[in-house]
Amino acid sequence: MPTPSNAIEINDGSHKSGRSTRRSGSRSAHDDGLDSFSKGDSGAGASAGSSNSRFRHRKISVKQHLKIYLPNDLKHLDKDELQQREVVEIETGVEKNEEKEVHLHRILQMGSGHTKHKDYIPTPDASMTWNEYDKFYTGSFQETTSYIKFSATVEDCCGTNYNMDERDETFLNEQVNKGSSDILTEDEFEILCSSFEHAIHERQPFLSMDPESILSFEELKPTLIKSDMADFNLRNQLNHEINSHKTHFITQFDPVSQMNTRPLIQLIEKFGSKIYDYWRERKIEVNGYEIFPQLKFERPGEKEEIDPYVCFRRREVRHPRKTRRIDILNSQRLRALHQELKNAKDLALLVAKRENVSLNWINDELKIFDQRVKIKNLKRSLNISGEDDDLINHKRKRPTIVTVEQREAELRKAELKRAAAAAAAAKAKNNKRNNQLEDKSSRLTKQQQQQLLQQQQQQQQNALKTENGKQLANASSSSTSQPITSHVYVKLPSSKIPDIVLEDVDALLNSKEKNARKFVQEKMEKRKIEDADVFFNLTDDPFNPVFDMSLPKNFSTSNVPFASIASSKFQIDRSFYSSHLPEYLKGISDDIRIYDSNGRSRNKDNYNLDTKRIKKTELYDPFQENLEIHSREYPIKFRKRVGRSNIKYVDRMPNFTTSSTKSACSLMDFVDFDSIEKEQYSREGSNDTDSINVYDSKYDEFVRLYDKWKYDSPQNEYGIKFSDEPARLNQISNDTQVIRFGTMLGTKSYEQLREATIKYRRDYITRLKQKHIQHLQQQQQQQQQQQQQAQQQKQKSQNNNSNSSNSLKKLNDSLINSEAKQNSSITQKNSS
């Protein structure tokens, strides 16, 4: 048989792989062995081939065809058939998993010299040229800037899985769109057929077994609508999250062919039944398989190694041995990946919201500009003169946002400025005063200078004291006042943001539950160690065994189990235990075990046990006297019957099963049923539309009484008062529980009173200190004023004294001058 030029021969092509260069020697030996096997000789090549073979005994497979030989056929077997297993294990130059390819396996098995022609692996013929290539493939190729445009899968981009052919086109043009205004496009036709394929594959995955049993359109319609509603709801959710108001919402991953198509629900309502009948006929023609065959992939769990049409086989990867540390690392990575994906989704939604807001803002600006243009034209038509800047958006000043911290900083700066100005004024005043004092001190005596220095020192000390008092007052006021909190967001740089790993809610809840269990377990172990073998615990746990106990005569049965120190003198005669207690109480199971006081198992047939009594053993308390089980059943039974002329009668009878012998009561004593019946009949027979008052209605009173009796019971299901349950839980008497609760309330109230009194004393002491500081400040101010007044009076008296001494001196001088003049005049007279 002639081989084509592009056929791959086993002698050449199989030895040109990447792994053939390393084992050329062994391969040549195998080739020699192959020749020797084909000729039937037993030379050195055969021994080399057999020594290097990789034959290994394998398990017999169900899919492998084995030839059965009889004992008579063993002597007639050919040597080639006996050594055929070694021929398969020749080094082929390909990988181990690819050696089982059908054509290669067939060539290796038939690798004998009896056949004259050479087998080859068939490949499609590519030597011929197609003359109509330019007719179907037009256009010029443009090389892209990058290889990856987006990360969508092939299924997201290829569109529908159904492709129209000529038969579908004729049906669409002649039977669907002929003579109708509402035309169905080819893309919409493919979408409908593809949705039919998906729905049938979901509802009838094994349709190929019985193609005639395909569902009708009405039966398949809910599945079609449900599959479309999932996608439609997802689009609506995205549309709502980004605050968009578009009716036709399209994502980036939608194919181009579906951008202008109508929704699937509309197509199903208008064209679904007609197109489904046509598609159903085509589905039956192909025996329930796909109308357009798809690639055959490897199914999970099935090994189709023989089928040559299975593409993309999986590699068998050896799974690594998992440890707890690897599981923890994987879970942490998955949590981190989940958080990153969530953050990416949130960022994408925020970006979409921002772009949507900017788009709406641009559209609003365009509308405003159009309205301004219309107003401008209207003004011109009405000869109204206006400004030329009507069509321009005037920039508005941004409102300055002042935070709490900025306001506090501004107030502090203003206070500092005021304090600095006051200090500068005080300093200037002091300098002026010092200069005046220096001028005066040059005229004063030493004693006056010392007095002035002492006054200055006292003023400085008083000023220091006042400043200290102000600081104490400010400190007390700041301690009493609450700090001002700032709610302004402070953005930290990326280098200062701590890398904190957020914990999951599940992990926190699990740790909380573990801690609670550990706390309870430790408490139980501690209690068990304290009790040791002296005391035993009697609780109301329904899964504990029930005891038949012999009680001592001198003990009271009402207080013994709840005493603070339990007695150990009780003797357990028998104990009953059931491994399936809920089933036993329901009557499903009758498994019960009986043990004596020594712990030995006894046969329950020896004891005359009442099954009804045993089923209620878990509700029985041997330590409570006069046990009563309060039921929620109504104490009176009613029966409704219809008599002659369709008259309805209600018969009543006391419920003797629920009534107690000790407290036998009936509602007949305090409920007037006759008045209730009269009221009902009067309402039915009369045409009065006025409603009866609720408090005057006997029927409403009866209903309220029934509800009160049903729910307002002071006892629980087992006949124990709710007020006694805390004492029972703490295993103490009710009086002890009342004393404990009262002491607890007393201690709490005493602590609250003590805290309140301490707080009041602190406030009172701070107020007294403030008053004392204010009183001292007032005294210091009064002393300063008195000292200033005394200094002024002294200065005035000194000035008066100096003036009087000067006047005396002048008088003396004038007297002396007058006397001198008189003497001179006398001397002149005497001389004359």
Swiss-Prot record:
Keyword Nucleus annotated: yes
Polar residues bias spans: 462-475, 819-832
One Gene Ontology cellular component: nucleus
Protein origin, superkingdom: Eukaryota
Its biological purpose: Component of the NuA4 histone acetyltransferase complex which is involved in transcriptional activation of selected genes principally by acetylation of nucleosomal histone H4 and H2A. The NuA4 complex is also involved in DNA repair. Involved in gene silencing by neighboring heterochromatin, blockage of the silencing spreading along the chromosome, and required for cell cycle progression through G2/M.
Protein family per UniProt: Belongs to the enhancer of polycomb family.
Further information: Present with 1110 molecules/cell in log phase SD medium.
Protein name, entry field: Enhancer of polycomb-like protein 1
Name of the encoding gene: EPL1
